[in-house]
Every structure is written in C-alpha cells, then in structure tokens.
Swiss-Prot record:
This is 3-(3-hydroxy-phenyl)propionate/3-hydroxycinnamic acid hydroxylase. NCBIfam families: PRK06183.1-1 (NF004827), PRK06183.1-3 (NF004829), PRK06183.1-5 (NF004831). Catalyzes the insertion of one atom of molecular oxygen into position 2 of the phenyl ring of 3-(3-hydroxyphenyl)propionate (3-HPP) and hydroxycinnamic acid (3HCI). It comes from Escherichia coli O7:K1 (strain IAI39 / ExPEC). PANTHER family: 3-(3-HYDROXY-PHENYL)PROPIONATE/3-HYDROXYCINNAMIC ACID HYDROXYLASE, FAD-BINDING MONOOXYGENASE. GO terms for molecular function: 3-(3-hydroxyphenyl)propionate hydroxylase activity; FAD binding. It holds the Pfam family FAD_binding_3.
Amino acid sequence: MAIQHPDIQPAVNHSVQVAIAGAGPVGLMMANYLGQMGIDVLVVEKLDKLIDYPRAIGIDDEALRTMQSVGLVDNVLPHTTPWHAMRFLTPKGRCFADIQPMTDEFGWPRRNAFIQPQVDAVMLEGLSRFPNVRCLFSRELEAFSQQDDEVTLHLKTEEGQRETVKAQWLVACDGGASFVRRTLNVPFEGKTAPNQWIVVDIANDPLSTPHIYLCCDPVRPYVSAALPHAVRRFEFMVMPGETEEQLREPQNMRKLLSKVLPNPDNVELIRQRVYTHNARLAQRFRIDRVLLAGDAAHIMPVWQGQGYNSGMRDAFNLAWKLALVIQGKARDALLDTYQQERRDHAKAMIDLSVTAGNVLAPPKRWQGTLRDGVSWLLNYLPPVKRYFLEMRFKPMPQYYGGALVREGEAKHSPVGKMFIQPKVTLENGDVTLLDNAIGANFAVIGWGCNPLWGMSDEQIQQWRALGTRFIQVVPEVQIHTAQDNHDGVLRVGDTQGRLRSWFAQHNASLVVMRPDRFVAATAIPQTLGNTLNKLASVMTLTRPDADVSVEKVA
C-alpha cells in the first residue's frame, strides 16, 4: 500500500527492523521488550521530551508483570502506592461501592496508584541498556509508505532537516489522534462524551487520606485521589457553558476546591488541564506491515484506570510475536493473532469504563437516586459485596482464538487466560517469583513430572530454539531430591502451594505458557507431544532446520 508523501531529499537515513512511532508508555514498553530480544529498534517522537504532566494514575497487576518482564519493575515500584482502593460515595458521603481487591495471583497487587511521568522516565532510561535501540525526539512523522518487505518513513526535525527510516515493521503508538491510523483510513469507531472534566494536581497533599474517592454529586461530580509522592488529584466535571479558561481563573478554581478542602487558598497547584473522555476502537489493529497499539488502537474513559493498562497488554501481546517473526522463528501470520486476541478485550474494557462513568455521573438525575437506593440494599448481600471488593467485575483477558490450542469446554478452560505467578523455591534455596525463573521465554511447566518425557527429540529441538524453559514443579520439601533431576529441566519448589491448587483445579499436569504469561495449551504427559504439534501449527512456527530467510532491510 503506497501513501503519498512530499518529494523530499532525506539528509539522514536509518535502517532498522522495527520503527515505533511515539515515545509514550506503549512505545517505550515495546522498545524495551524488543530491545532485550536483540531486535534493532528506532523510536521516533514528535515532542522534544517525554510528557511531564500526570495523566494516568492507575497501574494494575498485569502491567506490573509486564514491567517485570523487561527487568524494570524494581525501578517502577517506588513510584506506586499498592493496594489502592476505589470508593464510590453518595452526595452525603456514604460509600456504596468499595473496590479494594487483596488478591495477588499474578505476583503483584491488583490496584496501584502511580505517577505516570516518573514511570515513563524509568522505561526511557531502560532503553539505554540496549545498544540496538535508539530513541529520537523532535522527529515529526510526515509521511510513510509500505512496500512488500519494508515500510519507509519520512521524518522532519525541528530544524527542518529531513530523515528517512526503512524498517521491516512499523508499530504506531502515536496516541488517540494517531497520524498513522488516520493516514491509513482505519475507522476509529465510538463516541466522545458530552461532558469534559478539569483535572487539578496539587503538591504536598492537603488531605493526605489514602485511596481514591468518586463522589456521585448530581450538582458537580468529582474525584479525589491520593497519589505517590504526596500528590493529590482532584477531577471535577465541567458543566455546560463553562470553559477551561473560566475555570482556571483564581476565583473559580477557589470555588471548585472549596468543595473538597477547608482552606482552598493554601494549596500548591502543580497544573490544571481539561480532558474529554472518548470511547473509541480501531476497526483493524494490523494493516500489512503496520500495527496499531495503545491509544492509537483504542481509547477509553479514565474511570477504571484501564487506558494505560490496556496499552501495556497490547505491548506484551505484540512484542514477543513480532520478535519471533523477525527472527524467522514464525511466519508473519502470527501477527494476525494480535488483533484476534486484543481487540475484543479492549472493547470490554471500554464498555466497563463507560459504565463506571455512568455510575459516577448518570445522564439523568433519577438514575442517580435509583443507583443510591439499589446499591444500599445490595451492600447487605455478602456475595455482591465481595463482587465489588475483589474487583470481579473487571473483564480478565481471555482469548478464545489465536496463538493457543483449546481442548474441551471454553468456559472452564484455563487456556487463553493469564497463568498465575506465585513464589517458587529454587534448588539453591532462593525464593523468587515464577517469572524470574523463566525469563522472557516460553515455558512448559509440569506438576511433579518431567516436562520433556512426552516430547520427541525434534520437538525438544524446536521448542528449545525458541528459548523455552522446561520447569518441573514439586512440593517444596522435594526440591533437593537429586534422583528426580533431569537434564535441561529446571526444578522449582511450590513455596505457597498455589501451583498444586491450580493444577488440581484445572485437571491438567502440564501447561505451555507464552512469553506474555498466557496459557497457550494444557496437557498431560501422554498428550503433550500432540498438543505441541497443534500449537506449533496455529502459531505458524518454523522448524529450526528449515530454510527460513530472516528479512533484512536493505
């Protein structure tokens, strides 16, 4: 697909395997993951530096697991507040929905507050670990074109200098107003909310109460959120007829803050910004050699804090697949599973976020009265209360098709869901999270059994060529039993008993886990070989000895 571009003579040429448009969180995560896989990456960003004002304020357990996968979670955690509850309040201050899940099945707290600019800075600094990754700021993407085996990008610097980039693949992480998506004429379906919200960030938190509160005031709904490093965020609905300029005026800002603070004059304002809440979804996530990710593919209201986290899911899902294709270990048909797996869940998160917004600010006042009464009654039903407390309403990603092999009834199958991440004990006595023992790899994890037993020599060669780790899980008391050791198999102890419970619940003794920690297949030793053949087929894996030419950019 060719796209018209100016007749320009580039002064600088770049040749890479992957070009990423946009140095936001999704682009930076993609670059970190591909960087550690040895892929040549160039990130191009229109701005002259990272955005330094707070935007997203919620990071979940899945996103922290993604940070862990690229070795950055220890640097991210100091900028988070774990176990961050969300409470919906009536106009009189009564809590009618309390969301504070205390589960950590993926290894991290489910809800966390965070400061996005500081976490983005951690990811940018993380790129310095990889000589094969570069990030260029002050580069405006003016045009691009696709050929059979590459994408050509035309850039312009602040000084007007022209540059060209030739890449095998382009990942568009250039935001909700994505130039790439618009240029490709990909429909961005959905709607824009009629109401805007003004966000006010304050240093030296004048309240210092923990958690986040959503006050469902019919006169002017507002949000009060405690953030790390003593930052307080308030969000107020902008009412019809009000403008950002008016609300920024000192007397009007004082009036807003007097609603939530006893002394609105004694505050240290960081900044105020007006946001519009959109709920939109790209019709396609892959267009030949261009892939859309993050806000370029979907945008949603902020009320469940899932815009940022959905972008992290995109990056984790796409990066390992793109690396396999570039390395010649899979055909590019594998990239079609990115949209197949991610689009439906992104739609579910959009719908959840819209619903949460309607709970906070119902379109009709009578709906708010009904909400308050019904919620008061439901809170006296323990199952309903647990449903909110444990955040069970959040649609957990589950893939029904794509890079996986499903056996049996889909409703009860763990295939297509994220695998748990408990602590395990290594043979040297160290206790660590499961992913740390696996690295950024596939894993075949067996309960009590040698995971290689049911595999042919050819299969072992094929999966080892992918970097697969073969894990035998045993009760912790058996970890030092030398007679159970097998060459090429890592033995770990089930420190918390969670792996035993998981395998018992799902009636399987072997799991094939993808690099993004999703269950690709389950089996028992006698069926593993057949299951791996099916999985290799649906993932379009190549044979290690096959004559596969890895694409190179001229």
